[in-house]
Amino acid sequence: MNQKKIFFSLSIIVSSLSLASITHGDVKSKFIMEIKGDNRCFISNGIPNHTTGDFPVRGNPNEITEQSIDVCVPRSPKRNKESTPIRGIVGIAMNGVLFRPSTAGYWDPTARRQHSRNGDRRWNVEIFGVRGQLGLDFNNAHVGRGGLYHYHGVPTGLIESNSKTLIGYAGDGFEIHYVEDLKTSGWELKSGERPSGPLEKYDGTYVEDYHYVGGGDRLDKCNGGIHNGNYSYFITNTFPFIPRCLYG
């Protein structure tokens, strides 16, 4: 099995730990976390420690492939005043699977599915707005072109095997938690119709169908808030599901 190399700067924690392995095809999941100086480092082959959907599948012709993931990030993240939008990988889960909420699809009226990689970049397809088209499995995950299995939403299989709310770390080093409905997203679907592009009612098909409203005890625009006295990010059951920006 070919092995893809992934090397990027992220941030995650826990002192040396190996998770229980399962076999996916002829490959077992491998995940190690360890502290190296001021960094928390992760080594993973990208194979999850839980059952996945069958791939390839309709809407997703890619097969899960062993990866080479080597991630190190700061142990003591600092929250900045301004956030940074993130396209691509946002963080890593406690089983070595990556969080990558965005899609590579954009509105394209000439395409059979009305979206393509070469479409209008003002309208980015939201994967949960086109359910059934991009092959999400029961873990809210699917497979990228390079064979990378990754999460787009609540990682069901991981949560079922994890007794703690901590399910991962973001690229800036802050923790990622899932607390079901105890934390509420500050994002809402816009009302009315889109003024350009796909001229229809805002329905969640595109990321741009949502806007940040906030208020009260809602999470900030990066799906962040306070957990046990510390700033953390949260996976939520509603948009944005996984943070689309980071404050670190």
Predicted feature locations:
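Bacterial N-terminal signal peptides that target proteins for export
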Residues: 1-10
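Hydrophobic h-region of N-terminal signal peptides that target proteins for export
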Residues: 11-20
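Extracellular/lumenal glycan-associated surfaces
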Residues: 94-100, 145-158, 228-240
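Surface-exposed intrinsically disordered loops and tails
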Residues: 111-127, 186-213
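Solvent-exposed N-terminal domain segments of exported/luminal and surface proteins
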Residues: 21-133
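Short, recurring structural edge motifs at helix starts
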Residues: 134-141, 217-223
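Short helix-loop boundary/capping segments
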Residues: 152-203
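Long, compositionally biased interface segments
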Residues: 198-248
